């Protein structure tokens, strides 16, 4: 999924410039991506589309996020730490964090990693045309580097 998202970010200015899902799926197949990766990415994009009513503005509520038992059973501690870091740095709003967590909970537990959370965060921020602080953006973009080689051309 990471490579598919990197491809989308590289080839489309933003979420709105992507073709409809069925056309995008064919385009990604022609680009050589695995159908399972394409399906997972399209599912995550659908979650984002259905969550578009959330605010992209970072909230300054200072509220503490309490994770449910299901979330603590599935989300690694490092992922929960990343979510807290992104809130503290005002890189994502509380609503955006909830969308990311919701998307992560749709992924098999053994596939949930910090890099997966970073990539989903990038996908969400790209979809919302959000600006990021440089250091936070660099940290998130590091997830798009596989085997120390950029996936984007």
From Swiss-Prot:
InterPro entries: Smg (IPR007456). Pfam families: DUF494 (PF04361). Disulfide bonds: none annotated. Transmembrane segments: none annotated. Belongs to the Smg family. HAMAP family: Smg. This is Protein Smg homolog.
């Amino acid at each position: 999924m990471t490579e598919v998202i990197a491809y989308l970010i590289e080839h489309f200015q933003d979420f709105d410039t992507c073709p409809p899902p069925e056309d995008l799926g064919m385009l990604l197949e022609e680009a050589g991506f695995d159908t399972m990766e394409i399906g997972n990415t399209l599912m995550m994009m659908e979650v984002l589309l259905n969550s578009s009513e959330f605010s992209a503005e970072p909230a300054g509520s200072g509220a503490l996020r309490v994770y449910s038992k299901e979330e603590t059973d599935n989300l690694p501690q490092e992922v929960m730490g990343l979510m807290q870091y992104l809130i503290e740095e005002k890189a994502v709003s509380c609503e955006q964090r909830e969308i990311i967590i919701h998307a992560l909970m749709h992924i098999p537990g053994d596939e949930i990693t910090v890099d997966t959370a970073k990539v989903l965060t990038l996908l969400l921020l790209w979809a919302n045309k959000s600006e990021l602080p440089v250091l936070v953006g660099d940290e998130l973009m590091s997830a798009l580097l596989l085997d120390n080689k950029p996936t984007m051309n």
